[in-house]
């Protein structure tokens, strides 16, 4: 259809209302730059452009005169598509409509509305800007423009905030200041109150808001200079405070232009003084920029290009830079080498978001099949017209590059091939996201597409025409359609935004009548035929076009209509997108800030940029203590890149380091197997250290001077180190020859690390780096050594040994000499040991007590007894600290009497080693300080020393008898001492043994990069899981087993494709060169389906079509039904060959034999002589609103009639679950019993746990909506009592007559309780039982008047009585009584040492010392397995399961077929795009792969019954498709070998991603009485939301 408007205005603005509305609004106006009076006309269409009605008479100034109205612009409400505002160009007047222009109201307003900004969610809220007013006023309307109030003046720019980054009514303005600069201000109440107004940045030149980013520029002036020396770019990400962005360049910066900020990364054009513009790219926060592309084309009205003709056509800056929509990471840019002319313009493209750029691949042939003779190697490529080309060719402006989300990978552009843009232009099309191009049309054209790219249309530019060209195969072939009775001079070709419709609108005029607007509409739906079926689609990925498996770390697969399938997708086609992650490769990384590619680009190595003056390896500022940062190796992952894993990632991504920590306070370090914590004694705060991969951390120590932590992992049998000052990351220093390291001790004076290698047994020593190692003691002295303590100043070493034959406390010099047992009586299971002031303290687990003795084994006494299971011990000042395995806590008490016992930390599951550190602990002298040795210097008693050589190092004996070591490799002799050579390599480099420095990326890559092979030594051997992975031959990389024999070289050496069985393709398949089979119809369709292009090789006019298709003589394929239908569908007309069609009619045959096209059947026009083609046409055609096609292809239904419980399709397909996708019935919802509370996550807990202050549900729902919220208790609910001061004590200490709490609260409310003493309240600024120093710091009360200056001002030792707290002495025993360290026998009142009490021997004549003794037994494990050392209870399933759970390894010894337990390892889960959960695991150790299978179980959290998902599978992965979206499940995998099932309680908890909600129900419509034509729609929420239903 066509409409002549009889309108001669020279501009027309058209708007589709959208949201499936048929309304189109058009404004015809004169350009404001033209001389003479101005007026305008408004037109509206209610039938989607078939007809237009002129409504200009409705726009008047209130006096009925509409001729003087000159509407400059109209605005459409994004919140309500029926609302429009029209604004006059010269008069402060506007018109509004809320019903698609059916009624229009005019209002005089107090300002000239140069710009309006309508709110995205509130349809009544509008901002208006008066640029013509001297004060640049900003106004606001709350009633859609009827009334206005002024909210700000001196406004330069304004914008709404963007949700969710801003509150709903946030407004940003850039306000002019008298200084000439601007201030950026944000307000959430339209500047009504000061508290809701915030200054974002001052002294700003320009400001811009882009979604999550804020950008501003500021000129920085030098002192004494009137000219700006440089311009700064300030950036805010996610509304954080604005910060200055950093650019690595030595050139002065003149201007910034934000080219793109759409993919969590910012492209910025930076213009320099010499008019050269470079393109930079940032990390996600937009603060650190690296160079991406030089000499990019950029125009600025006051800068680059302002002296060219472009200044007459462009008043805003721009860059020739296009983001290819629909795919990630693809951009096209224009390079400018010289002046602003097309001879100096070239196009380049990037597929990795600016990591690398390359010329566009030119097509090999023209559209007529002639060779182009354009080769990249000769500097010839394809160049595409962008903004500058359009402006330079102002008489015939070239169309911009067209790419849209509606058709991923499809690009149409105007361009030319050659060495620059200055060639004849044609239309070029790419179906591969820019990887390949073909010439589609000769000469410039208008173009667009519809039906999600299913149909392309074009019209020739610059001439009169009546022909519309269209293509249904992505521009491979074109047909023509006569759209007008006579030629039309075309101004433009448009379709509704979104490119989903098949209706196109042509704007033009008949030339002979002068300019008069003509609107013509073409509906191309008949061309596409029937709806597409699954056979009409194929899966396509942009990465396939590049020959890579992945782009930007993942493979995105789109469902795309095949080029030669002629069918329609439909407006509601929801294109499925599948995304899968990939392992990292070098292409996933770019050079980090401060680095650049080396001059030899083929190496792809990033090296430090000499122009960068910063320190790229330093920690960031700020770097909070307790957090970590990634120290660069010169590379950074491209922003938005999602790759994970692989050898390259670990080499390039940088090492994680803790933020530097300057230790000041005294603190405890304790290990809990899977973590190590730091407990500050002054503040009482506990903090987990940033460590990774801990499996069995049982021993630790700390180098206070260098701030380095050492720990041993008995599960991995390694010793590791992490320096908290940021000097290095977590590193393994010893990994060989270790077997159950149970103790570590760092010697700070000589810088030596000692450890107990209990499984061998040995006590060994090494330097801090672990490369100089020596055995000090072996099995000749040791039996089952456990703990170790050093006295460096005395040269002594003490350890505990709990072997069966000679348990005791031992002492030797630190070189292992003079070893002797100093305590052997009454010792059975000595655990921890600590030394303080010539006293040795140890925990005795069998006797359940803590004892002490002096260095000679004398003056032995029991400090505490009746302890459930003491383990590690430490001494600090006047107190002992220990942890207890049974009570899961760390305790403190007096080191002399055991009094004042208190709990410091509770709920410590798996608590192991513990040590205390403080400033001054490492000070002192010994013989090694004054007289060092050549390598290892071991202190001895009596101020002696022993020079030792590490194992494997040769030595010589000097005349003095001293041993001198030869310096090993990497050490050099200086002053008779072997000194480690300094590492002069950068952190991103590896130092070879020969001193060379190589890039760290080259280490362990199977190449001799060092020259001495040292970079390939000690490389970890990649162990691949034989059940799920394949190991590549050369690289050793593990790839999924599914990649084996898939006809793709995934390894790079083709080893994954060797020894594969030959595969025969079917008759309907094509065999690729690699052996892969693809559908025969995909041959020669211009898609790289074989991934080696063999399906597109030798494609000429000969082509094989499917059986359901007709093959034209030129080789093209068309649907069989198009042959002999009266239309020439083949370009050569061979489908209508009379010799074939005389016998056949594939269209509609009239009774007289005439064959007409199928499209002419039932089209409302009589074509047969007897009108039979329009008879029996009761079946309606599918429209945009009736777009559900029944399976029988005979009926069309509205989507509201599908899956509604009623069958409307004759074949019932509208209610078919598979065809229509109808949801299943919701399953039964589980409820808890009357004595339980049901958590929000479905878990049932005891009702008494509701509102008790503890998170028993795991999601805090049991503590929500409590009338009197309870503070979370710090004590165990079951076996501890919480004192009034917050301390925790065992329940049995309650009401025992002793002040265990310290505030007597444990003795309150006791039967017959005595009068309690009155205590003084603790100052409120410190914790209970803490002292407040004069400086305000808090210390524990026990440190006051203890002889140590713990407060910085010494106030804790002021006004103290004269005493010597550090001198330990026992008070004299009263006459007739034993001393405090003795036990008094009941008869004869004999005194014996208290350590002899309960030692199993009768020392009192009456035997009273062995009465009322605790049971001398280890832990009782009635339902599990007890370790042989008696120190831990295990579940029965943890015995012989392949993991060392006992510290003595007894749980994995003497395993038989009857006791062995098979457990899967590394059970993990991932969710894909569709919501399916993939479960993966590793085979158990020692398990046979032939007779054992896996059973997979699952249950929803809160359920007690496990459901079977999969049984008797030999795969180590499983896909869970039965789980409900947005629900939490527990999943476990059990092993079954023959008939035996190995039960396990090990499960993982996972949460299924949100899914699509069910359809809403109870849909109702009602007319709104007070508003004519308004329909109110209401509905009930779906039964199953499958997640959070969000607003669109």
UniProtKB/Swiss-Prot annotation:
Domain EGF-like: residue ranges: 933-979
Cystine pairings recorded for this chain: 985-997, 992-1010, 1004-1019, 1024-1038, 1032-1051, 1045-1060, 1065-1077, 1072-1090, 1084-1099, 1105-1117, 1112-1130, 1124-1141, 1145-1155, 1150-1168, 1162-1177, 1182-1196, 1190-1209, 1203-1222, 1232-1244, 1239-1257, 1251-1266, 1275-1288, 1283-1301, 1295-1310, 1326-1338, 1333-1351, 1345-1360, 1378-1391, 1385-1404, 1398-1413, 1421-1433, 1427-1446, 1440-1455
Localization annotation: Golgi apparatus membrane; Golgi apparatus, trans-Golgi network membrane; Endosome membrane; Early endosome membrane
Ranges for the BNR repeats: 43-54, 139-150, 348-359, 428-439, 469-480
PROSITE patterns, per the entry: EGF_2, FN3, LDLRA_1, LDLRA_2, LDLRB
Coiled coil (residue ranges): none
InterPro entries attached to this UniProt entry: 6-blade_b-propeller_TolB-like (IPR011042), FN3_dom (IPR003961), FN3_sf (IPR036116), Ig-like_fold (IPR013783), LDL_receptor-like_sf (IPR036055), LDLR_class-A_CS (IPR023415), LDLR_classB_rpt (IPR000033), LDrepeatLR_classA_rpt (IPR002172)
Tissues with expression: Expressed in brain, and, at lower levels, in testis and adrenal gland.
Occurrences of domain Fibronectin type-III (ranges): 1463-1555, 1559-1592
Domain LDL-receptor class A, first and last residues per copy: 983-1021, 1022-1062, 1063-1100, 1103-1142, 1144-1179, 1180-1224, 1230-1268, 1273-1312, 1324-1362, 1376-1415, 1419-1457
Any one GO CC term of the record: transport vesicle membrane
Residue positions the entry lists as glycosylated: 6, 65, 275, 337, 523, 581, 725, 778, 975, 1098, 1152, 1366, 1454, 1514
LDL-receptor class B repeats: 707-750, 751-794, 795-839, 840-877, 878-920
PANTHER family: SORTILIN RELATED (PTHR12106), SORTILIN-RELATED RECEPTOR (PTHR12106:SF27)
Family, per entry: Belongs to the VPS10-related sortilin family. SORL1 subfamily.
Official protein name in the record: Sortilin-related receptor
């Amino acid at each position: 259809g066509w409409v002549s408007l009889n309108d001669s205005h020279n501009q027309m603005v058209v708007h589709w209302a959208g949201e499936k509305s048929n309304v189109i609004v058009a404004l015809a106006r004169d350009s404001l730059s033209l001389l003479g009076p101005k007026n305008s006309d408004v037109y509206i269409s209610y039938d989607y452009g078939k007809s237009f009605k002129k409504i200009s008479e409705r726009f008047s100034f209130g006096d009925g005169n509409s001729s003087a109205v000159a509407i400059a612009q109209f605005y459409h409400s994004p919140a309500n598509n029926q609302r429009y505002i029209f604004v006059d160009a010269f008069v402060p007047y506007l018109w509004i409509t809320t019903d698609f222009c059916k009624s229009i109201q005019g209002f005089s307003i107090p300002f000239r509305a140069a710009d309006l900004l309508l709110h995205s969610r509130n349809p009544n809220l509008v901002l208006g800007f008066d640029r013509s007013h001297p004060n640049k006023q900003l106004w606001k309307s709350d009633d859609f423009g009827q009334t206005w109030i002024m909210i700000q003046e001196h406004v330069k720019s304004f914008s709404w905030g963007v949700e969710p980054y801003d509150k709903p009514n946030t407004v940003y303005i850039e306000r002019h200041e008298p200084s000439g600069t601007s201030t950026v201000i944000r307000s959430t109440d339209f500047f009504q109150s000061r508290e809701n107004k915030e200054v974002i940045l001052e002294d700003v030149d320009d400001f811009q808001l882009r979604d999550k980013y804020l950008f501003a520029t500021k000129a920085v002036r030098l002192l004494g200079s009137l000219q700006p020396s440089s311009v700064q770019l300030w950036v805010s990400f996610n509304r954080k405070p604005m910060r200055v962005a950093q650019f690595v360049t030595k050139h002065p910066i003149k201007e910034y232009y934000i080219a793109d900020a759409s993919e969590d990364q910012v492209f910025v054009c930076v213009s320099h003084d010499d008019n050269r513009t470079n393109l930079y790219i940032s990390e996600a926060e937009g603060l650190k920029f690296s160079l991406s592309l030089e000499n990019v084309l950029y125009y600025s009205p006051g800068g680059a290009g302002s002296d060219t003709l472009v200044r007459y056509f462009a008043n805003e800056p721009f860059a020739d830079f296009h983001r290819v929509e629909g795919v990630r990471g693809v951009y096209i840019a224009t390079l400018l080498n010289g002046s602003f002319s097309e001879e100096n313009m070239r196009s380049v493209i990037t597929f990795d978001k600016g990591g690398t750029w390359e010329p566009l691949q030119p097509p090999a042939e023209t559209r007529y099949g002639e060779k182009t003779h354009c080769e990249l190697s000769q500097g010839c490529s394809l160049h595409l017209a962008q903004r500058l080309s359009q402006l330079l060719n102002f008489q015939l402006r070239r169309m911009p590059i067209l790419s849209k989300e509606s058709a991923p990978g499809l690009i149409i552009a105007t361009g030319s091939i050659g060495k620059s843009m200055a060639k004849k232009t044609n239309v070029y099309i790419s179906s591969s996201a820019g990887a390949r191009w073909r010439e589609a049309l000769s000469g410039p054209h208008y173009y667009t597409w519809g039906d999600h790219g299913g149909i392309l249309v074009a019209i020739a530019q610059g001439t009169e025409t009546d022909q519309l060209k269209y293509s249904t195969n992505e521009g491979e072939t074109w047909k023509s359609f006569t759209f007008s009775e006579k030629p039309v001079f075309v101004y433009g070709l448009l379709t509704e935004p979104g490119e989903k419709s098949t209706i196109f609108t042509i704007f033009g005029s008949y030339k002979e009548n002068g300019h008069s607007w003509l609107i013509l509409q073409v509906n191309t739906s008949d061309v596409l035929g029937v709806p597409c079926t699954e056979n009409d689609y194929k899966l396509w990925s942009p990465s396939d076009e590049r020959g890579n498996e992945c782009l930007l770390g993942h493979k995105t697969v789109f469902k795309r209509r095949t080029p030669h399938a002629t069918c329609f997708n439909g407006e509601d086609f929801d294109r499925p997108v599948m995304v899968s992650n990939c392992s990292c490769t070098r292409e996933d990384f770019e050079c980090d800030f401060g680095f650049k590619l080396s001059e030899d680009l083929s190496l792809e190595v990033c090296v430090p940029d000499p122009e960068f003056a910063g320190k790229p390896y330093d920690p960031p500022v700020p770097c909070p203590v307790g957090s970590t940062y990634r120290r660069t190796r010169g590379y950074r992952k491209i922003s938005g890149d999602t790759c994970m894993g692989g050898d390259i990632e670990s080499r390039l991504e940088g090492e994680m380091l803790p933020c530097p920590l300057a230790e000041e306070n005294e603190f405890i370090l304790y290990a809990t197997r899977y973590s190590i914590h730091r407990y500050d004694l002054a503040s009482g705060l506990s903090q987990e250290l940033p460590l990774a991969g801990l499996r069995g951390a049982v021993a630790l120590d700390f180098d206070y001077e260098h701030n380095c932590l050492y720990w041993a992992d008995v599960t991995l049998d390694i010793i590791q180190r992490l320096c908290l000052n940021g000097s290095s990351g977590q590193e393994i220093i010893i990994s060989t020859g270790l077997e159950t390291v149970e103790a570590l001790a760092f010697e700070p004076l000589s810088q030596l690390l000692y450890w107990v290698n209990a499984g061998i047994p040995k006590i060994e020593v090494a330097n801090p780096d672990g490369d100089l190692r020596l055995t000090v003691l072996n099995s000749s002295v040791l039996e089952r050594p456990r703990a170790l303590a050093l006295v460096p100043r005395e040269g002594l070493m003490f350890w505990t040994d709990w072997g069966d034959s000679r348990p005791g406390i031992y002492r030797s010099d630190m070189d292992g000499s003079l070893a002797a047992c100093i305590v052997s009586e009454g010792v059975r299971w000595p655990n921890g040991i600590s030394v303080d002031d010539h006293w040795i303290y140890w925990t005795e687990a069998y006797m359940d007590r803590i004892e002490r003795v002096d260095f000679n084994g004398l003056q032995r006494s029991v400090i505490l007894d009746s302890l459930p299971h003491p383990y590690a011990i430490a001494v600090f000042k006047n107190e002992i600290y220990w942890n207890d395995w049974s009570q899961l806590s760390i305790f403190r008490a007096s080191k002399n009497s055991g009094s004042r016992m208190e709990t410091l930390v509770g709920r410590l599951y798996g608590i192991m080693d513990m040590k205390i550190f403080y400033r001054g602990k490492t000070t002192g002298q010994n013989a090694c300080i004054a007289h060092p040795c050549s390598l290892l210097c071991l202190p001895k008693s009596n101020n002696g020393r022993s020079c030792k050589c590490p194992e494997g190092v040769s030595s010589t004996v000097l005349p003095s008898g001293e041993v001198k070591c030869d310096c090993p490799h990497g050490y050099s002799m200086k002053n008779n001492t072997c000194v480690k050579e300094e590492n002069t390599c950068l952190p991103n480099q590896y130092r070879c043994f020969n001193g060379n420095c190589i890039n760290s990326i080259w280490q362990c890559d199977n190449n001799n990069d060092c020259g001495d092979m040292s970079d390939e030594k000690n490389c970890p051997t990649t162990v691949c899981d034989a059940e799920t992975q394949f190991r590549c031959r050369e690289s050793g990389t593990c790839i999924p087993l599914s990649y084996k024999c898939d006809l793709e070289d995934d390894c790079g050496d083709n080893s994954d494709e060797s020894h594969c069985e030959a595969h025969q393709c079917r008759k309907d398949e094509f065999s690729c060169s690699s052996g892969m089979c693809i559908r025969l119809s995909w041959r020669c369709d211009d898609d790289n389906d074989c991934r080696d292009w063999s399906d597109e090789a030798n494609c000429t006019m000969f082509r094989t079509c499917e059986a359901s298709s007709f093959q034209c003589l030129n080789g093209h394929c068309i649907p069989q039904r198009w042959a002999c239908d009266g239309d020439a569908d083949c370009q050569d007309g061979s489908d209508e060959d009379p010799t074939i069609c005389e016998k056949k009619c594939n269209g509609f045959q009239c009774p007289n034999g005439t064959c007409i096209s199928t499209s002419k059947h039932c089209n409302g026009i009589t074509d047969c002589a007897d009108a039979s083609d329009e008879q029996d046409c009761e079946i309606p055609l599918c429209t945009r609103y009736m777009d559900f096609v029944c399976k029988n292809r005979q009926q069309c239904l509205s989507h509201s009639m599908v899956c509604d419980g009623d069958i409307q399709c004759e074949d019932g397909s509208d209610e078919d679950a598979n065809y229509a996708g109808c949801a299943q019935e919701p399953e039964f919802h589980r409820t808890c019993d009357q004595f339980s509370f049901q958590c929000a996550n479905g878990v049932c807990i005891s009702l008494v746990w509701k509102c008790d202050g503890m998170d028993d549900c795991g999601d805090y729902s049991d503590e929500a909506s409590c009338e009197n919220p309870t503070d979370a208790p710090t004590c165990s609910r079951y076996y501890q009592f919480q004192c009034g001061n917050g301390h925790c004590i065992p329940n049995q200490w309650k009401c025992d007559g002793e002040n265990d709490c310290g505030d007597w609260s444990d003795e309150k409310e006791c039967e017959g309780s005595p009068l309690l003493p009155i205590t003084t309240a603790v100052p409120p600024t410190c914790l209970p039982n803490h002292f407040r120093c004069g400086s305000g710091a808090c210390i524990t009360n026990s440190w006051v008047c203890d002889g140590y200056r713990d407060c910085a001002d010494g106030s804790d030792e002021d006004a103290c009585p004269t005493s010597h707290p550090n001198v330990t002495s026992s008070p004299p025993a009263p006459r007739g009584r034993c001393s405090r360290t003795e036990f008094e026998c009941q008869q004869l009142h004999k005194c014996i040492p208290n350590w002899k009490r309960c030692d199993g021997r009768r020392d009192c004549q009456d035997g009273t010392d062995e009465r009322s003794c605790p049971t001398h037994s280890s832990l009782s494990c009635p339902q599990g397995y007890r370790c042989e050392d008696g120190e831990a209870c295990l579940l029965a399933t943890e015995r012989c399961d392949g993991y060392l759970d006992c510290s003595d390894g007894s749980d994995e010894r003497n395993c038989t077929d009857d006791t062995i337990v098979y457990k899967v390892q590394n059970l993990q889960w991932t969710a894909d795009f569709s919501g399916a959960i993939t479960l993966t695991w590793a085979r158990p150790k020692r398990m046979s792969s032939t007779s054992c299978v896996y059973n997979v179980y699952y249950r929803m959290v809160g359920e007690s019954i496990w459901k079977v998902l999969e049984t008797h599978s030999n795969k180590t992965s499983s896909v869970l498709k039965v789980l409900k979206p947005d629900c939490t499940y527990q999943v476990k995998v059990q092993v079954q070998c023959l008939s035996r099932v190995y039960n396990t309680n090990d499960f993982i908890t996972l949460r299924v991603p949100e899914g699509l909600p069910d359809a809403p129900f109870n849909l109702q419509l009602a007319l709104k009485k007070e508003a004519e034509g308004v329909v109110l729609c209401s509905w009930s929420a779906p039964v199953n939301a499958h997640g959070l239903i969000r607003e669109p």
